[in-house]
């Protein structure tokens, strides 16, 4: 199940690894896990997914009032600060195919250490690797964009509000 992505004029075979903790993660745990994942060699990109943590109440009688959720915090990943806008329920890691076995050992160790409540790990293709129509609409000529952005676009959102690139 290896896919190919052109990355800086060379072809890299990539595989996605999905970590599915049995509980939502707190901001502190998310920060710790992401930093440990980024310490592994061969990581192409990491996507966190989960329930949104809005700044304001989106509907109902309290519409527009601020939501002071304890997990909507600024976390530091690899020295870069980012606002955590979701209650993390899954982490998708795109890895270089040649390093999959070594990375899987590291991911398994990270999960055992940080998720005492249990977790599942899946290997497969969970992200887009070929440009979508929305990518063309958002970026136009996609030959000049970072390949890690392929399939990450929300047509109605500003890029800086929806994607945070960690290098």
UniProtKB/Swiss-Prot annotation:
Disulfide topology: none
Does Nucleotide-binding appear among the keywords?
no
Keyword Protein biosynthesis: yes or no?
no
Provide this UniProt record's keywords sorted from A to Z. Methanogenesis
Superkingdom of origin organism: Archaea
Q: Please name the GO terms of the biological process aspect recorded for this protein, alphabetically.
A: methanogenesis
Q: Which NCBIfam families match?
A: met_CoM_red_D
How it assembles, according to the record, is: MCR is composed of three subunits: alpha, beta, and gamma. The function of protein D is not known.
Put simply, this protein is called: Methyl-coenzyme M reductase II operon protein D
Name the species this protein comes from: Methanocaldococcus jannaschii (strain ATCC 43067 / DSM 2661 / JAL-1 / JCM 10045 / NBRC 100440)
């Amino acid at each position: 199940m290896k896919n190919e992505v052109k990355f800086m004029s060379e072809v890299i075979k990539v595989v996605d690894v999905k970590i599915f903790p049995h509980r939502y993660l707190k901001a502190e745990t998310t920060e710790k896990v992401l930093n440990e994942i980024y310490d592994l060699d061969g990581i192409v990109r990491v996507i966190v997914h989960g329930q949104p943590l809005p700044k304001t109440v989106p509907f109902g009688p309290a519409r527009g009032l601020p939501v002071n959720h304890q997990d909507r915090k600024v976390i530091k990943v690899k020295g870069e600060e980012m606002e955590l806008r979701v209650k993390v329920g899954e982490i998708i890691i795109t890895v270089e195919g040649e390093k999959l076995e070594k990375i899987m050992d590291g991911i398994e160790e990270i999960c055992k250490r940080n998720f005492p409540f249990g977790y599942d790990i899946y290997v497969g293709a969970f992200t887009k690797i070929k440009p979508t129509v929305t990518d063309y609409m958002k970026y136009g000529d996609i030959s000049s964009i970072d390949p890690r952005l392929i399939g990450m676009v929300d047509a109605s959102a500003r890029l800086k509000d929806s994607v945070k690139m960690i290098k």
